[in-house]
């Protein structure tokens, strides 16, 4: 299973680092760094994982997170740990504190992969029982 990714960040160095991490992770593919392309991809519901910075000039990541389709999992990437609590209020899958190390990135990516694998499994483990009383 390959997961498509979008990077939304205003820092070129952070973008390059995340692109490098995505390239090193076999089950992740495709990244958009242009904010217009990213927004189009987000609204077209074509991204599985969104690596989203929080503090950005025009629209912050928290505001943008409310525009993300429910199918897309958000992993926040920020240098400000005080946003950690807020990130889980918008149902983020994970929160990576900058500077991001590859092992932390990989753990978050594995969490996303596991989430999608579980979401795609058929729900056959539910048993339905019907009792009828007939006179």
Regions found by a protein language model. Give the residues of each.
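Non-catalytic signal-transmission and effector/linker regions of two-component phosphorelay proteins
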Residues: 1-4
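Conserved beta-strand positions in the Rossmann-like core of class I SAM-dependent methyltransferases
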Residues: 6, 30, 75
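Short, flexible active-site loop motifs that bind/organize anionic cofactors or intermediates
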Residues: 8, 28, 95
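Short beta-to-alpha connector loops in regulatory alpha/beta signaling domains
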Residues: 9, 33-36
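Two-component/phosphorelay signaling modules centered on CheY-like receiver
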Residues: 11-30
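CheY-like receiver
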Residues: 13, 36-121
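Short gly/ser/thr-rich secondary-structure transition/capping motifs
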Residues: 32-33, 55, 129-133
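Conserved binding/recognition cores within well-folded domains
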Residues: 114-135
